[in-house]
Amino acid sequence: AAIRQDLLREGPKGSMWAAYTDDDGALVGWEERGSRWRGFSTGGEKVLFRLGSTDASRVCVTEAAIDAMSLADLEGSRPDSLYVATGGGWSPATEVALRRLASRPETLLVAATDADAQGEIYAERIRKMAEETGCRRLRLSPVQRDWNLMLQEKKGRGERWEEWAEGALPPDRRPPRG
């Protein structure tokens, strides 16, 4: 689904680059994830990675794009769901974008953050946001540390996505260079 939505590129050494967009769908940055490193594009803005229908009533908030994609896979990419990621941070632009989504009528804001201390901090922020905007809320916590680990367990793999992704994206999906 992420490839069909043109959200992924292959970076150096088989790394995954996930597109972050603003409310109008304009590209504002890339979350970069390699086998031994993580980062965000220099000069990019952490708004949201968005996978799924932009008018979905259910908004699942994860920390990383790989977890948003993993949760979508585990749930069968529910048509009523928009899977978003914050890039492991919570910028002012992220706050504004999430509030816009939470303020829509009939929104269910799902805190699908990691099952660790940082994930609980984000889940609490999401809970408060839901209360402030008047939307419904739910805490969906992975049994493993994160959704990617759960997906790998389900699929019977011992390795993480990053370890087998090298070359997985076609050449036309690679990030612009230069």
Residues covered by each model-derived region:
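Basic, glycine-enriched DNA-binding surface that flanks or lies within the catalytic cores of DNA
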Residues: 1-45, 50-53
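Conserved Rossmann-like nucleotide-cofactor binding loop
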Residues: 67
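Helix N-cap/beta->alpha junction signal
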Residues: 63-64
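TOPRIM fold recognition
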Residues: 73-178
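Short active-site oxyanion
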Residues: 55-60, 108-109
